[in-house]
Amino acid sequence: MVAWFKYGSNVAKLAVRRTLSQSCSYVARTRVVPSQYRFLHATVSRPKSQSAPVPRPVPLSRLTDSFLDGTSSVYLEELQRAWEQDPNSVDESWDNFFRNFVGQAATSPGISGQTIQESMRLLLLVRAYQVYGHMKAKLDPLGLEERPIPDDLDPALYGFTESDLDREFFVGVWRISGFLSENRPVQTLRAILKRLEQSYCGNIGYEYMHIADREKCNWLRDKIETPTPTQYTRQRREVILDRLIWSTQFENFLAAKWTAAKRFGLEGCETLIPGMKEMFDRSADLGVESIVIGMSHRGRLNVLGNVVRKPLRQIFSEFSGGTKPVDEVGLYTGTGDVKYHLGTSYDRPTRGGKRIHLSLVANPSHLEAVDPVVVGKTRAKQYYSNDVDRTKNMGVLIHGDGSFAGQGVVYETLHLSALPNYTTGGTIHIVVNNQVAFTTDPRSGRSSQYCTDVAKALSAPIFHVNGDDVEAVVHACELAAEWRQTFHTDVVVDIVCYRRFGHNEIDEPSFTQPTMYKVIRNHTSALQIYQNKLLESGQVTKEDIDKINTKVLSILNEEFLASKVYLPQKKDWLSAYWAGFKSPEQLSRIRHTGVKPEILKNVGKAITTLPQNFKPHRAVKRIFEDRAKMIESGEGIDWAVGESLAFATLLVEGNHVRLSGQDVERGTFSHRHSVIHDQETGERYCPLDHVVMNQNEEMFTVSNRYLLFL
């Protein structure tokens, strides 16, 4: 391979480079170029090509989208040479492929001297944008990041020059999605590059080509490679503007009233709020009825006030040191925690006229500790609401860039997403990526290019978006909701933004990031950027903007005055669903837990009787025979039998029982055997699933999972 790389053709070099790129080795093939738009990078001279041996052909029916990767370029060239000399020398499927390709090219107008190699190289360029286009996207609102742009995005690498820009090329009509499927077999290179730049190198960078699923990739290509960018109506833009003003003015109001208070504000990522609201609106349109939200401290007060609608007067009262009612002090409702750890729940009306229940889970200072809590609560809500398709209850987790890359609980939670009896039908992850973790730069906080690279292990799509472009944030959030409801797997929205102040408002960030904060001090806010955009478009006037600002400030001032006399009258973040929740004092009283002997014998018979045609391991069969004798005689009952009887009687009483752990089905010491296996067919059988008539199969859940700790 080394000799081939040294003396081979341009395409051969490209093939080796792409092979190396699969191990994420970008250093040898990238260079920093100016971030402004350009089609052609510098051309590098290379030695004359030599032939490579013809690889073994693969039937066309077995090809996937990956046949367009770099190594296939050499493959196809050699196959074509062999086919031109003798069509019978290649597989029949390849013979049909070349005949079809040449036939279409010959009948397409405006193509003079066009070759299969040129078209295939053009398709490789298209694929390069789909794979690496995010590395050229304009993601950093501060413009400080020097982004290495891969040579793969340079048309010169594929043999194209500026004189080719207005030439028409045959790109074919392929069984893939995106603009290659639009039945336009002939396009100019300039038009193709413009479309690719527009789709993949704007203010959203899409990472999805690591997903080994044609249907999913095609679905995303159809969403990404649209003929024109997403255009919002005047009414829709007014809604987005209103939500962005609320987000911005809320932080400004807190900063003006409580200058020295810690609030971990959202300044620099105010677009999160309209993004979340639009995501929830879209989710409701797609059938979601309940969303469980987990997040840490950054922007939490803004989410509490603007998304889940905790009364503003209550938030302001907490800033002023307001107290809880006497009857709540010391009870299980939780007291004494800081205001940016508290949760709440709310039935939110959506833009589409629906209502969706939102629940923001209380969160400690331990970053990401809430992740498994949110996923577990979502799974529980799905069970108790009989949401078997997992389309009505959804989890949303909001992370910081440092914690998403650095906390092990994130990876552990991600890997629960597709396990049987743990999946919730997909969680939407939003990363508030302000490009600094407290005082730590990204280069010291992770070894990967993106903080979201950990999610690639799940084949989750990742949408990187410039946090200064509110419409791009809205689009990415809506697309995430559509993905989740379509494919029921995790998806990540990475909002690349900045933190206008320190980690908290009394911290001085210039101690450790002087260059960044010199830029931030003079950087225009996302609200001002959007207002200017709308004014230039003529869709919104200055009077319209002033009217919204006046309305928002008036409400904030009214709520501030009301906060001076505010006294909470209910347990703030416990909704009606928790009305019967018992206190520790009520739960800790001694209760009678015994059951009648005849009940024990009845359930004992159920959990020791196996189907007639079921063939367990002979040792397991002997264990169940011994258990039946124990239950019948009442003598020699061991721990495993006692445990099974306890679970069975809980099921008889209508309780949901769930066991989770790496080896819980069999038991670490081969003692439980709650799930047994037919030695001939491999069929599984769980006796505790058959304790009562017509028992819900999820009423008793026992499920192995990955190793958590030793």
Language model segments and positions:
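Conserved internal helical-beta-strand scaffold that buttresses enzyme catalytic cores
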Residues: 2-443, 447, 453-454, 458-463, ...
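Amphipathic alpha-helical transducer elements in NTP-driven molecular machines
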Residues: 119, 470-477, 527
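Short gly/pro/ser/thr-enriched loop/turn and capping motifs at secondary-structure boundaries
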Residues: 436-438, 472, 500-501
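C-terminal catalytic or substrate-handling cores of phosphate/nucleotide-
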Residues: 464, 472, 477-485, 490, ...
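Flexible glycine-/small-residue-rich
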Residues: 497
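A mobile, often basic/glycine-rich helix-loop segment
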Residues: 514
